[in-house]
Design a protein with these regions (language model features):
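Solvent-exposed alpha-helices and their adjacent loops that cap or buttress functional pockets
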Residues: 10-12, 40-43, 74-77, 124-126, ...
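N-terminal glycine-/serine-/threonine-rich beta1-alpha1-beta2 phosphate-ribose binding loop
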Residues: 47-53, 57-150
């Protein structure tokens, strides 16, 4: 479910424990996945990376800010904004970004960023239940989808570039999402031209 390959697995002689070996870089993600599955946390966490903070992205972040308490209370869903980026800078924080002042934080504490370096940061964080939300119109950002999805990051795209590119690319993205057990959502593309 989390896209982590198990190198070796063994059951103890008393049949009360299971041990498995994974690559060290997947340790945190594996622990979060196991805890989420076995101990049924009080709420589900979605870790969002939002790219593009213009009209669409800015309004999305404002809606999330206003709805976070209600989503937690009524749906048991915690939307944790772990990354925000514009065309020049990115702000990344595993523990979550305060949406009350994210624009100022991005300008003062954000690191210089390109679509490629942002993709590397997202994959390097290796967080369970990650969702990359593309609110740009950039073909360079859309070109990252396959790589992100191969890293088990779901993609939600208001950007019409990927879904309206070649049919082969569209099929690749849909197949990658299906194979990886993640989401590729792009319904907002339909309204982009209206």
């Amino acid at each position: 479910r989390a896209g982590i390959s198990v190198i070796a697995c063994a059951q103890g002689a008393s049949e009360t424990n299971i041990s498995f070996v994974i690559k060290h870089k997947y340790l945190r993600k594996a622990l979060n996945s196991i805890h989420d599955s076995f101990f049924l946390s009080e709420y589900k966490v979605l870790n969002l990376f939002v790219v593009g903070i213009g009209t669409v992205g800015g309004n999305l972040l404002e809606q999330i800010r206003l709805q976070q308490p209600k989503l937690m209370e009524q749906n048991g869903l915690k939307l944790n904004i772990v990354g925000i980026a514009n065309s020049r800078k990115a702000l990344i924080c595993r523990d979550g970004i305060n949406l009350d002042n994210y624009r100022e934080e991005l300008e003062t504490n954000g690191m210089d960023s390109t679509p490629e370096t942002l993709c590397e940061q997202v994959l390097k964080m290796n967080i369970f239940n990650s969702v990359f939300v593309d609110c740009t119109a950039s073909p360079d950002v859309a070109a990252l989808y396959a790589r992100l999805m191969n890293g088990n990051v779901s993609v939600v795209a208001a950007n019409k570039e990927a879904a309206s590119s070649s049919y082969e690319n569209y099929q690749l993205l849909k197949e990658t999402a299906r194979h990886r057990g993640i989401k590729f959502l792009f319904e907002t593309n339909v309204g982009a031209g209206l």
